[in-house]
Amino acid sequence: MAETLEAVEDAVDILEKEMLSFCNLIPVNSWGFDDDVKESLKMRKHSLVNRQLSKKERKSMSAQQKQHLAKGLGLVPNTVQEVLEWMSKSKQHSKVQPQKVVAPVKRPADQNKNKEKVVKKDQKKQDKKADSDSEEDDSSDDEEKEETDEPVAKKQKKEESSDDDEDSEDGEEPEGNNGAVEAEDSDSTDEEEETPSKPNKTVAQSTLKSNGKIDKEIQKLEDDEDNESPEIRRQIALLRLQKKLKEMKVERKGKGPAKVTSAMAEKMAEEKRLKRRESKLKLKQRRAEEKKGKEAAAQVKKETVESTENGNEPVEKQKSGISFNNLKFEIKEDKQRGKKQRTAKKDRALKLTGRDYKSLIAKVEETKATIAKVREADPHKATIMEDELKWEKTLKRAAGGKVKDNLGMLKKALVKKNKMKDRRKQKWENRENKTEGEKQTKQDKRKKNLQKRIDDVKKRKMNKLRNKGRIL
């Protein structure tokens, strides 16, 4: 008996596995899970993804990136078996039955209502054809009039149906427009079917009269702790859509920003006139002040000229002690004047800069000699002196100064300097010799030319005399 029972159980297990493998071939969307299961799966995925991310990452990441992350973490069930296993574990969805998808059937009453609406719209359009308003404005006005004519109960029903339609249509769209709701997931479990879903808690349009109230409601929902949930995000998206529609209606009706009336235009013109008059008055005042200043300066000049002619000191001089062309200088005592402050011996010893290499070598040798003399008397004092000198030199170098205390380099520099001096001297002598030689050659040439000219004149005269027969 036990063997037969085990064989039956094995056969049942094999059959179950085969059935599950066949079930897994059916897509999750086509299986027929009800909307509660789909919504809870979606909520589970969102909550698990949000747990993995920080607040900043949630805001910065797009819906597509979040979907990729969910797939990477294995939060999206790909087969029917995975969904069934999850549902068997959860308390809410322990009893699972596939749901048949039924196409929505239009009621005759609804059809009649729609026909009546169409007839009314056509009549009103024909009546308003003479007006210059566009067809879009006419249709929007007709809809508003119909809403006012209908009873309150019908109006409420319409609002509920429109809210449901907006939820189903715009539930995934506002992510693209406003970035508030998550985009529709590519996974089959996240795709919403045409079956009626649970109505979300939305704010009625009647309560939101102005855009300010809509903004307040959006702010309230965003400040809520559970603002990451899809329901609240849908509500925010709907509110934003309402606000946008209201703004579009206002623009179409022409109730935009307030236009400038004739009274306002007059007021603005008056203000401009007053400003212009004020600026003119200020300009006149400034010119008058400048004129007064010039007159006062001329008067002072006149008084100074008169006082100098009479030999009296001018008023200005008495006040400040300065006249325009006479300045008084305070002469210091002869002791202080021309007396220069001598630099200390220590500072002079440290001043090892410049190109006077001879004096620099002398300074370095002198300091070395003094240190050697001190070392003979007190070696400790000599070491202290050396350390002090080293520190002072290093500090000077750190400050950007130069300390030329290397004897070998100084001697080389001196030799180089002397060589340069000799070279320049030689160069100058050569230049002088050359100029002297050129000068002498030019002078000799000039003398030669002059002598030649004199000789030519003499020859010409002698030839003339010879021709005349005066000279044999």
UniProtKB/Swiss-Prot annotation:
Entries under InterPro entries matching the protein: Rrp14/SURF6_C, SURF6
Entry superkingdom: Eukaryota
Gene Ontology process terms (BP): ribosomal large subunit biogenesis; ribosomal small subunit biogenesis
One Gene Ontology CC term in the entry: nucleoplasm
Keyword Nucleus: yes
Basic residues compositional bias, start-end: 274-285, 414-426, 459-472
Segments of skewed composition (Polar residues): 197-210
Acidic residues: bias regions: 133-150, 161-175, 182-194
Compositionally biased intervals (Low complexity): 95-106
TM region(s), chain numbering: none
UniProt-annotated location(s): Nucleus, Nucleoplasm
Segments for region (Disordered): 53-73, 89-232, 249-350, 414-472
GO molecular function: DNA binding; RNA binding
Keywords recorded for this protein, A-Z: Nucleus
Role summary: Binds to both DNA and RNA in vitro, with a stronger binding capacity for RNA. May represent a nucleolar constitutive protein involved in ribosomal biosynthesis or assembly.
Assigned protein family: Belongs to the SURF6 family.
Record-given protein name: SURF6 homolog gldi-11
Species the sequence originates in: Caenorhabditis elegans
Organism lineage string: Eukaryota, Metazoa, Ecdysozoa, Nematoda, Chromadorea
